[in-house]
């Protein structure tokens, strides 16, 4: 299990860190060293995900300044039996204030990662986007085009999840207005070897203000997605709800 402490100060005030633990049948034992954020204020480990065998880890630091203030980045680490070593270079945000690394996901084998930049302006101000990368043994290479949010202030990439083989991803945009202001939506995409193509229609929030898509999870085979609308009023004001789609 990997546990993030985004306000840990070992690498600087609020640099953040990650610890990984393994169960030996009786006790949880830390594996390797603390994985510290690059610098003060990075909030490293705000997002993280781990490969199927637990040997590869992707970690987001959405307020890292590597490509401009709050451009954000993600880093991938591999465990060699003793130490967590970074794989490849930082996956930096495209521009200042992108908040890249707000969300991350990794496939089962650990050779494909998705990184969400919820405040990217590629298609419109704060529309957000997701980028997917493959590991070739030396370098992380982008797979397909940016998956951009639909409209201004959608914050697409707020949440994301990836199937086991890495060929399907679900992306949440909780401030999308498709069914009313901030109703939110989720889109699911499939990789065809060249492009990321949307599967089916947008999965819209039920009502205005639901912020559906702030939380989501995709099944390992990519055929079922669970979506949280944490401000839905079905059970009372802001009681929240979850819906599952196939």
Annotate the PLM regions.
Residues 1-246:
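Conserved beta-strand/short-helix segments
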